[in-house]
Amino acid sequence: MASWVFCNRCFQSPHRKSSFSLTSCGHVYCHSCLLKGTKNECVICQAPCQTVLLSKHTNSNIQTFFLGIDGLCKKYSQETSQISEFQEKHRRRLVAFYQEKISQLEESLRKSVLQIKQLQSMRSSQQPAFNKIKNSVSTKPNGYLFLPPNSSLPDRIESMDIDLTPPARKPEMSAGPSRISVISPPQDGRMGSVTCRGPQHLSLTPSHASMTKASRVPPLQMPYKELSPPPASQLSSRATQGPSPSVSSSWTGPPRQPISISGLLQRQCAGSASPRGMDTEKMSPFLPSTPTNLRSVASPWHACVHR
């Protein structure tokens, strides 16, 4: 036990035969003074307390209070050095990591600066050619502005030209006749001349087209007279010769459509030129009736339009 330990009542220093006790209030008594006092009560401060016998088997926390200062400092210095060494080791590892990271960042920064310098030198060398191309392509031939790719979207929208004119429509061609046949009236028993004009000779406007549609002439219907019954000799001769091809074909075929002026004139010419002398009066039963008053015949020209 340390040399400074003694009894707080009789001031006796410890020896081999004596024993000392420690109270919870912090006082030390020898065994003889402890027996003189009241149990569970301190002799000096008269406060209730508990006592613990001091020996080698006492709790280490209690023994710490009786250690020497030099030994206590040595013990705690060793513990402190171990703790500081452990912390310093981890601190050095952290510093090494940050140093390596800083060196990597410095290297990347150096490369970036070098690359920027190279790009600036290339730009300065190519600036005249770029300005020339920019001036030549600043405006396109169709009048729209050329925008660089780095321009923002609102700038592009504001600079866009909007054409409000409606799209041009193709001129609508008026539906007109593909061919016009002009027939002059017959003169001296001869058929008039026929003149045909195709679409290449026509330049009809809508007004002319309406006039052309209005000037169409309906099919001409020839008047006919009732035939007197032929004599018996003519009937017998016709029976031996057989029926006329034109008449038989007219009866055997389907009903005929209205005959145009050109068809009538051709049939008239064919009837006058036949060797049997078939005239219009013989063909009249097969032709439609014509009104007596034909105003269209009195006109000098008749137009027949063929689709």
UniProtKB/Swiss-Prot annotation:
Tissue-wise expression: Specifically expressed in meiocytes of the gonads.
Phenotype reported upon loss of the gene: Both male and female mice are sterile. Males do not make sperm and have much smaller testes, a characteristic of mutants with meiotic defects. Testes show an absence of post-anaphase I cells, indicating loss of spermatocytes at this stage (stage XII seminiferous tubules). In females, ovary size is similar to that of wild-type animals, and high numbers of oocytes are present in mature animals. Complete synapsis is achieved but crossover complexes are absent.
Zinc fingers, RING-type class: 7-46
Subcellular location: Nucleus; Chromosome
Listed PROSITE patterns: ZF_RING_1, ZF_RING_2
EC number: 2.3.2.-
One of the Pfam families matching this protein, by short name: zf-RING_5
Coiled-coil region list: 91-124
Ranges where the record places region Disordered: 164-291
UniProt keyword list: Chromosome, Coiled coil, Meiosis, Metal-binding, Nucleus, Transferase, Ubl conjugation pathway, Zinc, Zinc-finger
Recorded GO CC terms: synaptonemal complex
SUPFAM superfamilies: RING/U-box (SSF57850)
Presence of keyword Lipid metabolism: no
Signal peptide coordinates: none
Domain of life: Eukaryota
UniProt key word Hydrolase: no
Pathway field: Protein modification; protein sumoylation
Biological process (GO), any one: chiasma assembly
Biased segments, Polar residues type: 202-213, 233-252, 259-271
Job description of the protein: SUMO E3 ligase that acts as a regulator of crossing-over during meiosis: required to couple chromosome synapsis to the formation of crossover-specific recombination complexes. Localizes to recombination sites and stabilizes meiosis-specific recombination factors, such as MutS-gamma complex proteins (MSH4 and MSH5) and TEX11. May mediate sumoylation of target proteins MSH4 and/or MSH5, leading to enhance their binding to recombination sites.
PANTHER family according to UniProt: E3 SUMO-PROTEIN LIGASE RNF212-RELATED, RING FINGER PROTEIN NARYA-RELATED
Name of the protein in question: Probable E3 SUMO-protein ligase RNF212
Species for this entry: Mus musculus
